Each structure stands twice: as C-alpha cells, then as structure tokens.
C-alpha cells in the first residue's frame, strides 16, 4: 500500500461512501481530497429541474457529514469550467491522481473524455471506475460483436454472465489533504445555488415526503426487501398507495449501488424459489427486470449516443409530429379532459413524482393521442421529476413512441378510460388529484363525457368550465395517428428507406478516435471507461430470423401477434458505433440520465427483435 499518494476524488452522481469504487481506491492508496464541482453552464439543455436540484442539495449535505465523520471535508466548487476547477484543486493540493466513477449519458461522455485528455496531457494519473452498473456497456455484445437493440436479448446475455459479488465497505478512516479553501474558490452548499428563495416553499413539501442521503437509501432498501418485495408483482397493477420501491431518486444520485440492490433482491428470489413461493419469485423477477431496464438505458445511451435527439429507428425521422404548443400546455397542466392523464400530470407538478404505470399512460397519451414530439415530453419529465434520469427518460420515451425496435407498436393507441378502470377501479387516484371530479360516481369517473347531464350536475361537474372537455376524442385521435403513420410510410418509400434500419449517428464529420499502443497509455487501465468509436460496421440488410419469417407468414394469413411482437424490427446492416477495445486516450472518457427507478419505471415487456 502506498500511503504517500495524494488523490482527488471527484464526486458526481455517486453520493455515497458504501460500495464506492473510486473512494475506496483512493483511501487505500493514501490521502484523499473529496470534491464536488457544480458547473451549470456545462449542463446545457439538461440543467436539472427544481425537484432534482433540491434532492442533490440534501444528498450533498448528507455526504458531507459522512465524510467529515471519517476525517475529511467535502469541498464544494461552483465554476464555469470543470477542468479548470480540477486543475486548481491539483495545484493547491499537490495531488498526483484524480479518480471518479463512470457516467454514461452523452453530455457526461463528452465532458469526461475531455477532462481525462487534459489531465493526461499534464502528466496527471486518471482512473475511473464502474460505480453505477452491474455490467459496463462495452462488455455486452451479441455474437457478431454488435450492440443489442432489444431488451430481452440484452438482459438474457447479462444474466448468463457473472456479477461481482464483493461489496466495498466504507473506509474506516480518511487521511485528508489540507488545502486553503479560498485558494480554490470553495463555497458553501447554499452558495452552489441549487435552490433559490422562490423555490423553498414548494421544496418544503418534498422535505416532509422524502429523506435523501445514502444511509436513508440503505434503510429504505431493507424495508422494501423485507416487507414489500413479495407483493411487488401484485401491487404493480395499483396506482394508489405505496406500490413501488421508491428507490429511483437514490439510484439516480448514486446514494445506493445498483449492485447492492440487485444482490438483495436476488437473494430473496433464491430463497423463494427454494421454498416454492411462486408469488415471491414473480415479484423478485419483475423487480430485477426493472433493474435490467435501468442497465439497458445506459447501454443504449452509450452505444447510440444520439438517442436524446433522434429516434433509434431511422424511418421515424419522417414521422409528422404535431408541434402544437397549446396541446402541449394542456397536457402539462392536466387539462386534457381525460381524468387519469390529468391526475398524473397534476401529481407530477405538485410532487415531482408519478407511479411508473402513470408515467407510461401520460407519455403514451402525449405521443399517440396528441402526436406531440416525444422529445418535448422527455424534456418536461427531465425538468419536473424528482428522480429525473436522462438515460431512463430516453429509453422510456423512445419505447412508448415506438422509436426503438422492441417498443410499443407505432399504431398502438391505449384508451385512458379503460386503463383507468384497470389500474384505478375505484377512482381513488382520480379523486385525490382532481377534486372537481371527487363527487362523480365511480361508474363515470374515468369518462365523465359519457355521464348523463343530471349526474354531472348533481356531482358539481360542468364540462368545459370546471373540468375540461376531451382535447380530442378517441376516434379522431386514432384517425390522426393512422394518417401520420401513412405519411411516414409514404416518405420512406420516396427515398427508399428500409422500415427496420437503426439510425446511423451523424458523426461523419468527425475523425476516428486516435488509437494508441498500450505502452503509450500508462494512465489507462482495463477498469477505465471507454467511449463510442467513430469506426462503423459494414454489412448488408439483416436476414430475418426464422421465427420472424414465420410471423410474417402468419400476418399474411390474417394472424396478428401484435401483443407479442413489435411491428418495428432492428437491422444489423445499419451503420452504428462500437466501443474500441484498444488502449487510447479516448478510452479514458466518461458518461451521460428519467424512467427512473427503472425498477419502478417501464414495466411492460419488451419484444424479441434485435441482435441475437
């Protein structure tokens, strides 16, 4: 053990001391200088919303107290340039190494790659670690060496691999590096500006409902595993009450490691399998599948880093989204005239939270009923959700809009009234968030437009006055969606585009990453994060697997397996990026974040298309 090394630990979305690879490695080698750097300018269009910033502030305060108890202070820095702040820390502390844990979103990938390059150029050792995932995105490929584009195939491959089972305990003591705070422009947590005075009254409601911080995450996980997990599958069909794990914001900010969550649930699954407890097994499997969806969201963002801007399926660039600001405003404000949708959007605005099922329903309504651009909805979720997570948001909205190979069928249009009867049969959720409908009989509460005038009058409901009329009726919405799909197909035919092609990233103008020989990259290790390469695949249009050919034959005979398969298919012929396994400065880069506790986000089954 080298006890003379001075290391800067750069905290980001890994605000914990347990099972934190970067912190553990630095503490093992010598003295540490923990730092959190807040650079609003670098967040760009993905500057966190009010609720997310509130959580970050509370979590940082919790982490700061924990580090102080171990003997080291957390230095907070607000800056206009991250690399400049890190270089200032190096200059003042005399540190010779910088460590941090990986992120996987496009914004972070670019930033972290730049940071590593600049530090390596100055002779500073840089090491990054996997502190967020079970498997790194560059570890999971199909037998052809290409990224999976279907969740089922991806997750099956993951479950066939081993998982690191050793949990890293928190350091028992940290050796601090003393540095003059004023020399590096350190600030207080209030001076970070994560919360302004106008936001504090609204945030007070969050304080009563949530307890951010890594130690609180541990308590919540233990309670969920021991008391609620067994009923997780049964409760997933309810939108009222405490039917989810509520772990999503803790996972987003890295207050608990996904490895710890996975292992706890997996242990219960093994016990229930031994005891032949089928209900428990089903619940554990559903919860673990949610963890897999969170993993998959990072995987997609890493291997297809354009997905926050473009649909993964190339033909959907022709889809005629309706950029109607008035409809978007009505959707945001919960004034669509569809009670379940409106209740969900009002809950989101009031609390920064929605049940995963409600997230699916309101997002589906936005893109299928109103034909609003899915990127608008994704950005609004990012701005308002307490557990806003860009990678999960991207996966969720692309899935719902039919923009990924195993997403919802493009022509799928779910009736909110029927979904309300299924997931809120007594209307409890509606009455909680739409008090103007509280007196309406349960028979009509999910479709008040069908209620007799006498019933509406007796319930104090006047459609168009104190509650909105439907913004669009179902038949009209179905007709408009069909026309949009028809226009999309016509545009495809005009340019000869295949309906199953994966979008090629628009990086033609960029040169390929510089590849160095291993001997020329002394600061790079096998643990370091890699970045997508500009090297492209070659190939021809995908040959359909046998079962897909059979499916197509059945469709031609009038047999539609729409419930089992997506109408979209992936294409291995497309130009996509892969991760270079060679040692390079580029391989030292870092990562990029809403359906949030993916274990609590998209619960629908994904299809079987994609790289096998």
Swiss-Prot record:
Disordered as annotated region, ranges: 539-576, 590-612
Motif (Nuclear localization signal) on chain: 541-555
Post-translational modifications: Phosphorylated by CK1.3 and CK1.4; in response to blue light. Required for degradation. Adopts an open conformation when phosphorylated upon photoexcitation and thus interacts with signaling partner proteins. Not autophosphorylated, even in complex with FAD cofactor. Ubiquitinated; in response to blue light.
Post-translational modification Phosphoserine, affected residues: 587, 598-599, 605
Phenotype when changing residue 321 to A/F: Photochemically inactive in vitro. Undergo robust light-dependent photoreduction in an in vivo context via an alternative electron transport involving small molecule activators including ATP, NADH, and NADPH
GO molecular function per UniProt: ATP binding; blue light photoreceptor activity; FAD binding; identical protein binding; metal ion binding; protein homodimerization activity
Result after altering residue 367 to M: In strain: cv. Cvi-0
Biased composition (Polar residues): 596-612
Keyword Acetylation appears in the UniProt entry: no
Organism: Arabidopsis thaliana (Mouse-ear cress)
Region (CCT2/CCE2, mediates blue light signaling): 486-612
Entry keyword set: ATP-binding, Chromatin regulator, Chromophore, Cytoplasm, FAD, Flavoprotein, Magnesium, Metal-binding, Nucleotide-binding, Nucleus, Phosphoprotein, Photoreceptor protein, Plant defense, Receptor, Sensory transduction, Ubl conjugation
Residues annotated to bind Mg(2+): 235, 243, 355
Null allele phenotype: Plants show increased root elongation in blue light. Reduced attenuating effect of high fluence rates of blue light in the cry1 cry2 double mutant. Slow rate of curvature at low fluence rates of blue light in cry1 cry2. The double mutant cry1 cry2 exhibits a reduced impact of near-null magnetic field on flowering in lower blue light intensity and short days. Little detectable phenotype on circadian clock in blue light (BL).
Consequence when changing residue 397 to F: Photochemically inactive both in vitro and in vivo
Listed result of changing residue 541 to R: Impaired nuclear importation leading to reduced phosphorylation, physiological activities, and degradation in response to blue light. Forms protein bodies (photobodies) in both the nucleus and cytosol in response to blue light
Protein name: Cryptochrome-2
Biological process according to GO: blue light signaling pathway; chromatin organization; chromatin remodeling; circadian regulation of calcium ion oscillation; circadian rhythm; defense response to virus; flavin adenine dinucleotide metabolic process; long-day photoperiodism, flowering
